[in-house]
C-alpha cells in the first residue's frame, strides 16, 4: 500500500487507531499521515534520469569493439532498465519499511533471478557450467575433493599440543552464519515450533544424504550440539525475544519535520528501519486440514531451499566461499520475509477468491526451478539409493505423520460426532423418563393413558371421588 493510503490516527484531541478491519494478532498503529517527498513514487524523475543516461551512452560514448564486453554491458543495462521500471511501477507488497521501493526492488530481482535460472535450465550441462565463466572466469572448473567428517573425538588424547583441536577446527565462519541465518529465519516464520522442526529436520536430511554430498558428513556433536543447540538454538532464541519486543512495541509515527527535537528526529530515522506495524503469526496447523497441509508445505519448501544451496554449489561447480553463494543467501533473506507474510495472509484470508502474493509465487517458482537444475545437471548423484536403515526411518516417519493426519482430521471428527450424537440421545431419553421431555407421539392421542398417569378419570374427576369410590 502506498504511503498516503496508510492508517492515520483520527481526531486532534486523542490518538485513536483505526481498528476496523484489523486482525486480533495485528498491532495498533498511530500515524499522523505525513506524506513527504521521501514517500512519493518519483516516476517522472526516474524516467528523466534513465533517458539522460541512455542518451549519453548513445550519443556521446564511443561503443567499444569488444563483442564479449558489449554483450555483458547490454545485458546489465537491460536488467537495470527493468529494475527502474519495477521499482517505480510494480505493485507494493505487505512491507513498507524502510521504503516500499526497497521491497519492489527485491521483487524485480526475483524476476531476474528466475529468468536466469530458466536460461541455465535450458542449456546443456557443459554449456551451463561454462556459461558461469562470463560471470566469473574462475568458475566452470570441477571442485577439488575435500575431506569431511574425519576425527570426531571431542578430546583427542593423542594430540598432546591441543586435545580439543577438533572443536577449534569447526569454529569457522559458518558458526556466525548459522546463528545469523536462524535469527533471520525466526523473524520470517515467527513461530518457535516451526523453526525447531525445520532445524532438526535438516540435520536428519544431512544424515540421510551424506552418501550423495560429502560435505553433509559431520560429527554427531557438530550436528546436534554446535548446530541444533548452540548456533541454531541461540539464533532462534534471540529471534523469539526480538519478536516479543516487536509485538509489544508501540507503533506511533510522526513526520520527521513534525518532531521538534534533534534527538527525536534521530530516533525517528533509526525507527525507519523497523516495521511500520506488526502481525503476530498464529499458524494453528492442527485447527484444520487446510492449515495442516499448508504448514507442511511451508516446511517442505524451506527444507528444499536449504538443500538447493548445497546441491547447486555441487552441480554448478561453485566453491562455498564464492560471492554468488553469499548473494543468493542475501537474496533469500530479503524475499523470504515478504513471502512468508504473503503466505500467512493467504491462509488467513476469508475471501472466497484468494490470490497468492507475488513474492510468494516467485519464491516457490525459484525453489522448484533450482531443484530442476539439480535434477538435470547431476541425476546420477540424486539417484544414489538411500541406505536401507535410512529409508526405513523415513518410511516409518511418513507412516506416523500420515496416520496422525488421518486420525486428527478424519477419524477423530467422526468419533467426536458419534459421541456427541450418542450423548444427545441419552440426554433426550433421560429427560423423557424424568417427565421433562417434550410430548411423544402417543401423548397427542386423546384419552390414552393420560388419566391413569394423572390419577384421574376420563371425565377429569379424581379417581377417589368417582362413583366407585362413593359406593
Swiss-Prot record:
Coiled coil: none annotated. GO terms for cellular component: endoplasmic reticulum membrane; membrane. Residues 1-40, 96-104, 313, 376-381 are cytoplasmic. Pathway: Phospholipid metabolism; phosphatidylserine biosynthesis. It is a multi-pass membrane protein. The chain crosses the membrane at residues 41-61, 75-95, 105-125, 292-312, 314-334, 355-375, 382-402. Residues 62-74, 126-291, 335-354, 403-471 are lumenal. Keywords: Endoplasmic reticulum, Glycoprotein, Lipid biosynthesis, Lipid metabolism, Membrane, Phospholipid biosynthesis, Phospholipid metabolism, Phosphoprotein, Transferase, Transmembrane, Transmembrane helix. It comes from the Eukaryota. It is found in: Endoplasmic reticulum membrane. Glycans are attached at residue 159. GO terms for molecular function: CDP-diacylglycerol-serine O-phosphatidyltransferase activity; L-serine-phosphatidylethanolamine phosphatidyltransferase activity. It catalyses: a 1,2-diacyl-sn-glycero-3-phosphoethanolamine + L-serine = a 1,2-diacyl-sn-glycero-3-phospho-L-serine + ethanolamine; 1-hexadecanoyl-2-(9Z-octadecenoyl)-sn-glycero-3-phosphoethanolamine + L-serine = 1-hexadecanoyl-2-(9Z-octadecenoyl)-sn-glycero-3-phospho-L-serine + ethanolamine; 1-hexadecanoyl-2-(4Z,7Z,10Z,13Z,16Z,19Z-docosahexaenoyl)-sn-glycero-3-phosphoethanolamine + L-serine = 1-hexadecanoyl-2-(4Z,7Z,10Z,13Z,16Z,19Z-docosahexaenoyl)-sn-glycero-3-phosphoserine + ethanolamine; 1-octadecanoyl-2-(5Z,8Z,11Z,14Z)-eicosatetraenoyl-sn-glycero-3-phosphoethanolamine + L-serine = 1-octadecanoyl-2-(5Z,8Z,11Z,14Z)-eicosatetraenoyl-sn-glycero-3-phosphoserine + ethanolamine. Its main location: endoplasmic reticulum. Residues 1-26, 423-471 are annotated as: Disordered. Belongs to the phosphatidyl serine synthase family. PANTHER family: PHOSPHATIDYLINOSITOL SYNTHASE, PHOSPHATIDYLSERINE SYNTHASE 2. This is Phosphatidylserine synthase 2. It comes from Rattus norvegicus. The gene is Ptdss2.
